[in-house]
Amino acid sequence: MKTFIKYILAAPLMLCFSSCLDEHPKDQLDQEAIYNNADNIYKNAVASLYNYIGSNQESEGLQGTCRGIYDYNTLTTDEAMNPIRGGDWYDGGLWENMYQHKWNANDINLYNVWKYLFKVIVISNQSLSIIDSHKSLLSAEQTRDFTAEVRAVRALFYYYAMDMFGRVPIVTSYDVKLEQVTQSERSEVFKFIVDELQDVAPQLADEHSNKEGDYYGRVTRPVANFLLAKLALNAEIYTDDNWTNGKRQDGKNIYFNVNGEKKNAWETCIWYCEQLRQEGYELESDYASNFAVHNENSKENIFTIPLDKNLYLNEYHYLFRSRHYKHGGAYGGSSENGTCATVSTVKAFGYGTDHVDNRFKINFYADTVLVDGKKIYLDNGKPLVYMPLELKLNLSDSPYKQTAGARVGKYEVDRTAYSDGRQVDNDIVLFRYGDALLMEAEAKVRNGEDGSIELNAIRDRVGMPHVEANLDNILKERLLELVWEGWRRQDLIRFGKYTKAYDQRTPLEKESTGFTTVFPIPQRCLDLNKKLKQNPSY
C-alpha cells in the first residue's frame, strides 16, 4: 500500500550524555555486513533515523503519542485540557499541573522528552561518523547527500529541543565525553540550527516528502525551508537569552544571510514561505482532505509522519484519548474519554452563535453524536451529547463529568484501524502550506506590510468572510486553522499571551517574567552533568 524504506534499527543512546551508545546489542548484525555498500549505508545510517519521528511509546515521537512534545505544546495552552472526570484523569495531578503551568525539574515526562530528543541527536552523530568512516564505499555525491540529510534531521530535533528547553548542549561528535559537554545559550543553538539548515538545504532533494515513493517521510529541501521560515518567525524569542527580563529584540533588527542577501527576520520568513510556493505547494480546495485516511497526495502537506497500520507501529492517540468510551465503541474499539477543547476555543469558532466557523464540525465532535447516522446511547439509556460549554478543569462534582467538552476531530476516522483506533492510515501532519501562508501574513504585518492576501486565502478556502490582517486576527486564525496540530504554545509565546490568565488558569507567582515559556532542564540531567545549569526561576 504505502512505500517506505525499511531498515535496521540503530542502537539506543546514552542518557543526558552520561554514557556511550551500546554498539553491541545481542541482535545487532555484524557492523561491516550492514555497512558494506552504499544502499546499506543509507538504510542503516540515514533511513534508520526516521524510525524516531513517530512512535508508539509515551513521550516519544514528534506527534502521535501522549505525555510528550505534542502534549506540552497543546495541553499547556488555552486550546485544550485533560479535565479530571471523577476518578478518571487525575493521574497524580499531571494534567491539571500541565494546564496550570505547575511543572518542575523532577517531571518524569519532561525528562523522557529530553531523553528522546537527545537520543535522536546522538544517533544522528553516530550516523555521521559511520558515513565518514565508510566514505571509501561511497561516491563524493553520496557522501555529500547522506551527510546533508542526517544533519538536517539532527537540526530538526535540535529545533524541538531548543523550543522546549532553551539552553541545551550542542554536541556534533559521536564520541564526545561527558566532561566535554557544555551548555549553550538559546541564541547559540538557534544560530547553529539556522546555519546547519542553510548549509545543507542545497544538497537536499527537492521532492515533496509527504508523497509516497523514495522520499516519503524524509527531510527534503521544502521541509528545511518550512523549518527555516518557522525559525525566522520566532527569531525574537529564540535570540533572547534573558527571557525573564521582559525585553527582546525587534525582528526588524535580527538579520539573516539568505541566498547572499541580508534580510531581517520578517523578510527571511517571507522569503522561505515564497520558496514553498515556488516548490509547488498550494492549498487543497478541501480543508479536510489534508487529514483524510489516505492523505499522501495532499498538495498542501509538507512533512508528515507516515502511518500504515499494516507496516509500522507508529500510532496516533489523540482521537482515542478524547472520545467517550461509547463513542469509541461505536467504531468497534474503545476510547479514554479525555482531551477536550477549552470553552474559549469553541467560542473562538463561534460555537453557540449564528456565525459558527465552517471548520468547527471538521475539528470537533460536539452536541449529539451520530455514527453512521445513528445516535450513541450511554449506560443510562440517554443519547451521547457532548457539552462544549460545560467544561471545567475539575468535573468531579459536575453532572456533565462524562460528557463535558468538545472532542478532538480533524482526522478522518479510519474504520479499519487497529489498537482501538490508535494504529491508522492517516499520516500525521507536522508541517503544511496553510501554516506557511499564515506565517507569511504575520511576518508581513510585523514588517509593516499588508498580509491580507495570505490571511484571507486561508479563509476563502473554507468559505469564511475576509477579516483585516492585524496581529489579533492572525493569532485567532492560527487557532481556527491549526487547532490540534501542536502549534498553540509557540504561538502564544510569540504573541506574549502564554503566561496570561485564560480559561480557568490563573498565572503563577512571578510568571509575568516569562519563566514558564521555557521548560526546566530535567533534574536527572543536572545531577549527571554539573556543567548544565537550570533555567531561570526553576
Task: Pin down the residues of each PLM region.
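Conserved, well-structured interaction surfaces
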Residues: I34, A38-A47, N51-G61, R85-F165, ...
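Short, surface-exposed recognition loops and adjoining beta-strand edges that mediate ligand/DNA contacts
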Residues: E32, E60-N82, Y174, L204-V223, ...
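Long, intrinsically disordered, low-complexity segments
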Residues: S19-D22, L117-V120, F192-V194, Y215, ...
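Glycine-rich, aromatic-lined ligand/substrate-binding cores of catalytic
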Residues: S55, D286, N290-H294, S298-K392, ...
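Membrane-proximal, proline-rich intrinsically disordered regions
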Residues: S19-T74, Q249-D250, C525-Y538
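Flexible, polar/acidic helix-loop-strand segments at domain edges
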Residues: Y90-K102, Y351-F431
